[in-house]
Amino acid sequence: MRYLPKSQSDRDQMLRELGCATIDDLFAPIPAEYRLTRDLAIPRQYGESEILDFFKQRASENANGYSIFIGAGAYNHYRPVVIDSLISRGEWFTAYTPYQPEISQGTLQAIFEFQSMICELTGMEVANASMYDGSTGAAEAIMMAVRLTGRHSAIIANTVHPEYREVIATYAQHQGLPISHVGYNAETGRVDIKALEAAITDQTAAVLIQSPNFFGTIEDVAAIADLVHKKGALLVVSISEALSLGLIKPPSEADIISMESQSFGVPLGYGGPYVGVIATKEKFVRQIPGRLCGQTVDRNGKRGFVLTLSTREQHIRREKATSNICTNQALIALIASIFMTVYGKQGLRELAKQNLAKTAYAVSAFEKAGAKVLFKNSPFFNEFVVQTKSDSRELNDKLISDKIIGGFPLKKFYPELGNSAVWCVTELNAKAAIDAAAKGVAQ
């Protein structure tokens, strides 16, 4: 893309339109001490070979060969090579947004297939094309429950990802939506059922839980669903580790499922871009946020795909929209679709079994090394909480020297758990690496 700078006459005309005589007048509202008065420190332009050398040097600084034991919403799973090969095709890998979407039948079919696979995976009847990520998906699911029930408050379990809770708080603040929280059972690491029952009122629109939760334990979704529904509220279940559905019964007792699909072939990528999704029952379809792709036939009787029920801000008046998110994570959803297709039902199940088996081995190894594993009598998938004598951050600093990236320290969000961290084990953690991590924690 060419760079076409503005001429001085262009700048003068723009200033006149704004009622300013000079650039200084334009920036007058910004205090002088915060304004840059020198040229930007930009190096000279590079030739092509120099640019390649520059990025090779930067790439050589990457940290390779580390054993990653941190999850907490972003999981280090194997990415089949075929994914990047397929998504790099020009039909997919483009900055173009199809504002006449029916022209791009291939894109719409890919979205439709993604929705179909998500429904099969979650046991729900309808799924949207995507949300930004798991956190925005959870927030949008609560707003959806508010619209469906006409009630005006929500309850969130403290075992939900802390940063998901922060995103929801931002949404709720600007919607004037009261949010309350319920704690967890100190023995099980699961939602405190009695506290939840006492917290639900006739104004509670939604109860949000996460399973597996932030501690890695699997919640009793059926029992919580019965309790929530008896009170006339809706149950929203957040899933941050999508691979768990390869082995664990999907929480179909929920009214709405919000899920982060990063585990399905999406690179960690410094936290994004990821792909959230909302799945729900068909009777709630008109309040689901985000894009929906439907299958139909054209006037010649041929199968075709269309965007349907487009009730987002991009298409209708803002105040009537179900969501103000105008971006669809179509390319990232395609990655997840390719991943699920490559592995298939049996492959996902086998991959999930490997995660569970290696995590069970890690729990045993950590205990043998003298570490205390919390909530160990509760069912888990691929994360567990380890409590140590030394500070978790200091421990991680020591482990880094052995090329081990340790667990996620909990003290910031759960001070009552002291020197504890959530450790994650996936199919990429070899037995030798698990043993080395356990030994490092013991020392």
Swiss-Prot record:
GO terms for biological process: glycine decarboxylation via glycine cleavage system; nucleoside metabolic process. Its EC number is 1.4.4.2. The keyword Oxidoreductase applies. GO terms for molecular function: glycine dehydrogenase (decarboxylating) activity. Belongs to the GcvP family. N-terminal subunit subfamily. Keywords: Oxidoreductase. The glycine cleavage system is composed of four proteins: P, T, L and H. In this organism, the P 'protein' is a heterodimer of two subunits. Pfam families: GDC-P (PF02347). It catalyses: N(6)-[(R)-lipoyl]-L-lysyl-[glycine-cleavage complex H protein] + glycine + H(+) = N(6)-[(R)-S(8)-aminomethyldihydrolipoyl]-L-lysyl-[glycine-cleavage complex H protein] + CO2. SUPFAM superfamilies: PLP-dependent transferases (SSF53383). Transmembrane segments: none annotated. It comes from the Bacteria. The glycine cleavage system catalyzes the degradation of glycine. The P protein binds the alpha-amino group of glycine through its pyridoxal phosphate cofactor; CO(2) is released and the remaining methylamine moiety is then transferred to the lipoamide cofactor of the H protein. It is an enzyme of class 1 (oxidoreductase). This is Probable glycine dehydrogenase (decarboxylating) subunit 1.
